Amino acid sequence: MSSEDPPGKLHRHHLAPSDSSQAILDAALRVLRPHIPTSIPLYRRLQFGRFFPDSFLFTNLDLGAPSLPIDAHASNGTGAGSRPNSHYRHEDPWLIAFVDRTCRPETEVWVFGSWEDSPPASSPSPSPSSPTETQEEWQAIDNLVAELVRACRNLPVPRSLHQDILDAQQTQQQAADTDPAPSTNPPPNPFAAARVPTIQLWGAIHSTTATILERLDVLASTSQVTSTAANHTFMFDVPSLPPPSALPDGLEWGEVKREHFALIRSKSEIPRWDRTMASLPSLAIYPAAGNCGSGGGPPVAWAFIGLDTSVTTLHVEPEWRGRGLGKTVTTKLFKQGMQRFWEDGVQRLAHGYVVLGNKASEGMMRSLGGRDMWKCYWLRVDLEKAGNM
């Protein structure tokens, strides 16, 4: 393969800690770096680490390290070497994806495609204003995303990191289903789909790629783009953020404590499990010790840095709102919790997601200087549909 050859078929790289996987990570980050900020969700996810034996990186680029070529009809490929290749024609689409089914029911896939940063000029739909060449570009992009979905379908499904919780939920659900006279209607379980191994959660999916998944008809019936709330993606230049404001009297800083994980999960529309929260940098605001005997109580505001380093699970208790605590905790978390992700010569950016319609959070992000860059989605892909493509 010469330096002028286009990207080839998808290859699968293991990300379990090793010298070879570090070389792959370094190469992937080099490819993604010029595409920041659009590539930042995947870029930061790879920086964060927290890889398991079933953590994989998929790409059709030659990253210069041994990899497994993907056979669309088999779950295991044969080993193959590859040679460095860092020059790709603009019209040849490429993607890099992080996939780990161990993390279900939480996000299993982050992906960046070259078309997200530089899409073909015209619509993929045939029309007099859409030249054949552009339609062929979109078809190549669709084919590449379809190949990724098929590759995900053919992965083994490991035991979930949260299997004990999923099993307990299933037992509770079975008991409720057999109760002849339930006294109350149990709340819907947002992670019920996680017990179905063919349903896979893709996160922070750029609106352009979300449209491709919809066009391929691989989204679960309950996770269509048209019926799923999109998210604003806000970007922050951390060095330009003002210093965090001083806390009001009677409050003090701390980290989120494990004993408060259940409270935090109950306040979020996207619950995160204890093992994940324990691995994330966090910041919380507590009643000060000795403050009218309330010291040691639960936090009144909190936020985490997520696996893709976005500010996540940001919450201020209702009785404490209107005092700027959300802005204060976000600013302090960005300035102190992101230190290990900074690199020489790379702009120090942080980001956060706000669901469309949440005007309060959107206003807070804008007041901090956040730039609304693009829309993204969390979507469930039905891997059984991959056979129909």
Residue locations for each model-derived region?
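Short amphipathic alpha-helix that is part of the acyltransferase structural core
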Residues: 2-41, 237-273
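Conserved glycine-rich acetyl-CoA-binding loop
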Residues: 313-328, 345, 357-359
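A conserved beta-strand-loop-helix scaffold within acyl/acetyltransferase catalytic domains
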Residues: 271-319
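Conserved beta-strand-loop-alpha-helix junction that forms the acyl-donor binding cleft
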Residues: 201-207, 347-362, 371, 380-387
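Active-site rim helix/loop that mediates acceptor-substrate recognition in acyltransferases
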Residues: 33-68, 73, 262-292
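A conserved short alpha-helix in the GNAT/GCN5 acetyltransferase fold that borders
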Residues: 321, 330-338
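Conserved active-site alpha-helix within GNAT-family acetyltransferase domains
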Residues: 208-222, 341-342, 354-374
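Acyl-donor-binding surface of acyltransferase catalytic domains
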Residues: 44-248, 378-381
